[in-house]
Structures are given as structure tokens and as C-alpha cells.
């Protein structure tokens, strides 16, 4: 039986394009303190630019101590998962390496990469039998993180779509990468002032209270910050995002000096779809309630009985999708968490309360409903 210590420890590097993943990778390889490190680099282009940078960086790859595997023209969280399985399996079986570093592409979500380690092959074996996820690292660009989050650009508009009908936005991706991290490397701090750096660190701590935040410039982390931390735990990772903790009643202490806080809205009645739509499209992003960086939770709409919706907003982008059949015995129809700077929680709560359906409206017939139709197949039993 392969023990925890014997299995090949794996660190996965995530982060949006330009955040500094390859610079950090080069720094780790150049300061690896005698450790034997294998590297898998994933780049979406036909020519693997990241692999070339690693080869030409300060850490020349030794054929005896290190191995560089290139994966191009696809993303390891979807099209190249079988290739990733094969490569990690091979490297683990060789038994020559102390650590494996995987640099995912700038448009990869970390959770599917992590799930690869639990993916069962045809023979029933999993990658986790030979290798173990040790640390999920996300590199954040201190200069561009908040502007990109607020921008709301679609990946397809930048030519960064991963698959057909890829509807994700930059905001979605940034939030996924931050919320699933064990370690968040806040990079490029030499390019921002102290106040901005402190506010960013506090914001990231609110979005993912469980992650360790490592402030650096030029990707210069200590090797022990990203290798051999034994920080990854799938169950903990799924409960790590700040919004999940708030809904569970695990309130994160306020970081008042930076003006970052959170508020929870709960209600028993469903929302009036017309009033809620007006609030979402005109009120939420107006600044009247502060700057809402993240909101997420569960909600119901009058006129759509039996269905619970998932509310997910990151920066300027909000999504509303059906997620489950409604439990008639559940105490609340609405459970929403809002995280942001300068939040006016009372005003936000009052505005949301004003969107709830009234007793008179319940039996008054069809309500104005501008929300897109929901495909509830597979969500609600017919």
C-alpha cells in the first residue's frame, strides 16, 4: 500500500494570464534546495510559450533531476485530462521525483484539475493512488485583479474561450481561482502602493478565509510556501469560500480598517421577479450599497414554484440558474451572502426586502418575469 508520504506530492499553479505563474515557477526551480522536481506546463497555444520560458529561465532543467512535460493546444481541466492522468501516472511510477509542479493555463479553473486526482480509470484505479494533491496555489496580479474583476469581459471576446459555447467571464474565472486556493500568492506588489496592497490582501482573505496569503514581488516565494505544505483537503476546499462560511454561520471577523465586510440576507417569501430583476440590473452595481465584489447563495422566484435558484455574482457579472428542487420544510426561501467594500448592509437588506412578493401579489395571477427561462430538466422531478 502506498502511504501518504510515499505518494508523489503535487502542487497545482493557477492564475489568470499575466499574473506571474511562469515567473514564480522559474523562481521555485532556481531555488529548489536540492529537491528533484518534475514540471508539467499547460499552455493553450500551439507553441508552448510557458515551456520555452521555463527552459530559458534562471533554472536550467537537469535531465537527471528534473523533467519538463509540455501539454499544448488544450486545457488540462477538460480536453487534456486523459493526457494529464497518463503523465502524472508515469512520473509517479518512476519514483525519481520529490515533487511535481503543474502549471495550468491562465484560463483553467482549479477545481476540475483537482478532481482529476479522484477520477477513476477503466481498471478502477485513481491517480490519487500514486500521487496526492499537496497544494493548490493561485497567483493574483496585484495591479489588475480588481479592475479585471469589475470589468466583466467575456473570455470569448478576448479569444480565450476554452470550448464551444464557453460563456464564462474573466470575473467568473478569477473568483473560481481565488476561492479554491490553499495558498494565494499576491504578486507584483512592487507595482502598487502599500494601502492598495493591504486592501487587496484583506479582500482576498474575505473571499477565501481558509487560504494563506503570501505577498511577493517578481514571484519570489519561499519554496516551502508552495511545496510540501500538505494544505490541500477536498472537503475543506469545498467549504473554504467566504460565502459558504457566512451561510454556515462562521462569520469572518470584519476587516474594518480596509472597509471590507459582509452581510447575509434571509427571507421566507419568494422574490417578485420583476422587482428583483430591476434591483439586479440597476441597483446592485449602482454604488448605492457600496462596492459589492461577490454575492452568492440561493433564492426563489414567485411564479417558478418548486425550484431553488443559484445566485452567483462576481464583480460586474451575475448569473442566476436553477440548482435544486425546493424543500417545502426549509426555513428560508432566500439565503444570500454579499461581500464588498463600504457595504451598507441595512440599506442592501431593505432593498432586497422590497423585492419580496407581498401577500396581495401571491394570488393575483401572473407576475412580470424578465428573468431568462430556466431549463429545470434534471433539477425538478417531473
Protein language model features and the residues they cover:
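Conserved strand-to-helix beginnings and helix N-cap segments that scaffold or border functional pockets
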Residues: 51, 81, 111-114, 194-198, ...
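Conserved beta-strand segments of the P-loop GTPase G domain that flank and frequently precede/overlap
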Residues: 40-42, 138-141, 185-188, 264-266, ...
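Fold-independent oxyanion-binding glycine-rich loops
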Residues: 104-105, 140-142, 188-189, 314, ...
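Nucleotide-state-sensitive switch-loop elements of NTP-binding domains
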Residues: 2-172
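Residue-level signal for inorganic ion chemistry
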Residues: 43, 103, 136, 181, ...
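Small/polar loops that bind or transfer phosphate-bearing groups
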Residues: 41, 79-80, 102, 215, ...
Amino acid at each position: 500500500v502506498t502511504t501518504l508520504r510515499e505518494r508523489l506530492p503535487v502542487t497545482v499553479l493557477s492564475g489568470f494570464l499575466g499574473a506571474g505563474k511562469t515567473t514564480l515557477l522559474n523562481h521555485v526551480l532556481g531555488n529548489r534546495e536540492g529537491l528533484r522536481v518534475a514540471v508539467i506546463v499547460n499552455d493553450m497555444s500551439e507553441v508552448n510559450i510557458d515551456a520555452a520560458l521555463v527552459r530559458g529561465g534562471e533554472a536550467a532543467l537537469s535531465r537527471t533531476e528534473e523533467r519538463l512535460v509540455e501539454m499544448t493546444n488544450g486545457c488540462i481541466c477538460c480536453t487534456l485530462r486523459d493526457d494529464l492522468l497518463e503523465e502524472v501516472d508515469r512520473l509517479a511510477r518512476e519514483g525519481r521525483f520529490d515533487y511535481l509542479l503543474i502549471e495550468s493555463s491562465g484560463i483553467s479553473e482549479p477545481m476540475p484539475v483537482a478532481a482529476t486526482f479522484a477520477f477513476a480509470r477503466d481498471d478502477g484505479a485513481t491517480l490519487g493512488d500514486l500521487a496526492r494533491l499537496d497544494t493548490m496555489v493561485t497567483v493574483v496580479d496585484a495591479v489588475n485583479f480588481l479592475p479585471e474583476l469589475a470589468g466583466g469581459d467575456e473570455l470569448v471576446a478576448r479569444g480565450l474561450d476554452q470550448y464551444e459555447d464557453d460563456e464564462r467571464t474573466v470575473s467568473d474565472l478569477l473568483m473560481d481561482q481565488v476561492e479554491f486556493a490553499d495558498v494565494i500568492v499576491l504578486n507584483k506588489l512592487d507595482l502598487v502602493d502599500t494601502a492598495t496592497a493591504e486592501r487587496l490582501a484583506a479582500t482576498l482573505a474575505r473571499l477565501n478565509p481558509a487560504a494563506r496569503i503570501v505577498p511577493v514581488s517578481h514571484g519570489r516565494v519561499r519554496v516551502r510556501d508552495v511545496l510540501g505544505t500538505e494544505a490541500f483537503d477536498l472537503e475543506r476546499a469545498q467549504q473554504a469560500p467566504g460565502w459558504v462560511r457566512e451561510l454556515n454561520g462562521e462569520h469572518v471577523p470584519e476587516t474594518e480598517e480596509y472597509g471590507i465586510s459582509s452581510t447575509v440576507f434571509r427571507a421566507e417569501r419568494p422574490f417578485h421577479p420583476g422587482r428583483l430583476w430591476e434591483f439586479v440590473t440597476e441597483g446592485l452595481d449602482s454604488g448605492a450599497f457600496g462596492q459589492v465584489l461577490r454575492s452568492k447563495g440561493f433564492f426563489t422566484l414567485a411564479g417558478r414554484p418548486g425550484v431553488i435558484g443559484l445566485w452567483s455574482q462576481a464583480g460586474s457579472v451575475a448569473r442566476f440558474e436553477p440548482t435544486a428542487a425546493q424543500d417545502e420544510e426549509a426555513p428560508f426561501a432566500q439565503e444570500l451572502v454579499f461581500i464588498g467594500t463600504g457595504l451598507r448592509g441595512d440599506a442592501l437588506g431593505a432593498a432586497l426586502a422590497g423585492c419580496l412578493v407581498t401577500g396581495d401579489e401571491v394570488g393575483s395571477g401572473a407576475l412580470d418575469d424578465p428573468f431568462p427561462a430556466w431549463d429545470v430538466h434534471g433539477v425538478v422531478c417531473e
